[in-house]
Amino acid sequence: MPEKRVLGIEGTAWNFSAAVFAEDLVCLHSAPYVPPTGGIHPREAAQHHASVASDVIRKALDEAGEKIDAVAFSIGPGLGPSLRIAATTARTLALKLGVPLIGVNHCVAHVEIGRWYTKFADPIVLYASGANTQVLGFLNGKYRIFGETLDIGLGNALDKFARSHNLPHPGGPIIEKMAKDGSYIHLPYTVKGMDLAFSGLMSAAKEATQRGESMEDVCFSFQETAFAMCVEVTERALAHTGKDEVILVGGVGANARLQEMLAKMCEERGAKFMAPPRVYMGDNGAMIAYTGKIMLEAGSTIPIAESVVNPGFRSDQVEVTWRHDAGQLFAPGQSETAERGAEASVNLTDKDVVKTRLAKGYRVPELDRHLIAERTRAEARAISAARRGGVPVPVIRDVTDHEIVMEKLDGDVLKYVMNEEYAKGAGLTVGKLHKAGITHGDLTTSNMIWHNDRVYLIDFGLSQMTEEIEPRGVDLHVLFQTLESTTENPETLKSAFINGYCAAFSEAENVIRREHEIELRGRYL
């Protein structure tokens, strides 16, 4: 039986693109919108799409030649005016040809074209584009978001910095070129568990040029800092899930330095890394056509009447009907066997744990040394303060600038054995931690151990001594994301955690409300 042939239409933001996919890519035609000055204006981008749509579609259909079996289009997320042009074009064409219509999630399409090209079965995916920066993995029918930007997408941060210095759009490739002649200067490095924030980094980069630092040095340091943040959270997802494949997708992923850094991280961990070629990295019709094809084969078409665009369509809202595997993940009840986490190696003796923070080959040495020393000191201070506050934590035996010797805890790591009892226990412990004026910073189930009928916390490298509500909310957000991405009953576990948290901490309700606000920030921006 011949392969189905699907026409895909991409039009979420800056590029109007159409492609036909069968067994392989048949053809791809694009007409990108380039603003004369500044960034992308949604109305002007939509006007551009409307003016080029007929020509782009005609070229794709003429080159494809044979009959089209379905029309797929990017239904969201994206800029509303641009999405509506693509959707109207797709509906009209589907009706004219008498073929099914398929609404494709733009972010998931980036993931699927990456899986198709690399042949990786179940990877962790770093998706870095203008408006989106996410770390994703598949579990039980959905792409789960392990971490994402809490303010601005990486590509938009690069573009805004470039525009502030009168560089043309898009700014990323120009920054990449200028960075090749630069040297490292310190800029803010903001990782919150597996989440990221780029606005402070962007502002600091602007200030650095204003005080006389060269553009080459600032571009180099902006890239090195932002990319190291992305690679770190990707490694955290690898370490937490036990997966062994990484794919880089999205327009920013075309950057050679980001690819080099991810490849180095994976080499050090014994994981595999690949990125699709440049033609599949930025927004393109091929990814919509391919994802539309596998959705068609799974029966996931959409009636015309229900094909309303969704500018805020999240990756984790998509029912992935075309994948029949559950997604590889650590099995419940499995014992901890790994002696290397995302940041450190762990050596066990009869009574002690020796935690050694490892140099990262993907980070520039100056940044790497700074983070290792800073996080080792922060961890030792936080554990000692938490213990004084009555929080269940291991006893510190000795500390150097890169190593901590602490009490060995015999018990189960919660990521393998999480249940309602343990979730409530985690809530009690975190409530005590916040009451003591400490936030953890990396509150995942990898960093919780059930020991002596209580939940103990470990790995305080991202901790803060603070009573501010924002970092407390981030703690809860990181944990809730972890539960959503790695458990089958996250709502039940979150409810149990909240019960324990409220019992231990009088300000719990305010923090829970802040966590919800933080959750709403992690959207298409």
Swiss-Prot record:
Lineage: Archaea, Methanobacteriati, Methanobacteriota, Stenosarchaea group, Methanomicrobia
Species: Methanocorpusculum labreanum (strain ATCC 43576 / DSM 4855 / Z)
Localization (cell): Cytoplasm
Keyword tRNA processing: yes
GO molecular function: ATP binding; iron ion binding; metalloendopeptidase activity; N(6)-L-threonylcarbamoyladenine synthase activity; protein serine kinase activity; protein serine/threonine kinase activity; protein serine/threonine/tyrosine kinase activity; zinc ion binding
Keyword DNA damage found: no
Functional summary from the UniProt entry: Required for the formation of a threonylcarbamoyl group on adenosine at position 37 (t(6)A37) in tRNAs that read codons beginning with adenine. Is a component of the KEOPS complex that is probably involved in the transfer of the threonylcarbamoyl moiety of threonylcarbamoyl-AMP (TC-AMP) to the N6 group of A37. The Kae1 domain likely plays a direct catalytic role in this reaction. The Bud32 domain probably displays kinase activity that regulates Kae1 function.
Residues annotated as binding ATP: A338, E339, R340, G341, A342, E343, A344, S345, V346, K355
Chain segments carrying region Kae1: 1-322
Assembly, per entry: Component of the KEOPS complex that consists of Kae1, Bud32, Cgi121 and Pcc1; the whole complex dimerizes.
Gene Ontology annotations of biological process type: tRNA threonylcarbamoyladenosine modification
Details of cofactor binding: Binds 1 Fe(2+) ion per subunit.
Annotated GO CC locations: cytoplasm; EKC/KEOPS complex
Residues reported in the UniProt entry to bind Fe cation: H106, H110, Y127, D283
UniProt-listed Enzyme Commission number(s): 2.3.1.234, 2.7.11.1
Entry protein name: Probable bifunctional tRNA threonylcarbamoyladenosine biosynthesis protein
Catalytic reaction annotation: L-seryl-[protein] + ATP = O-phospho-L-seryl-[protein] + ADP + H(+); L-threonyl-[protein] + ATP = O-phospho-L-threonyl-[protein] + ADP + H(+); L-threonylcarbamoyladenylate + adenosine(37) in tRNA = N(6)-L-threonylcarbamoyladenosine(37) in tRNA + AMP + H(+)
InterPro entries on file: ATPase_NBD, Bud32, Gcp-like_dom, KAE1/TsaD, Kae1_archaea_euk, Kinase-like_dom_sf, Peptidase_M22_CS, RIO_dom
A Pfam family matched in the record: TsaD
Protein family per UniProt: In the N-terminal section; belongs to the KAE1 / TsaD family. In the C-terminal section; belongs to the protein kinase superfamily. Tyr protein kinase family. BUD32 subfamily.
Disulfide bridge positions per record: none
Enzyme class: transferase
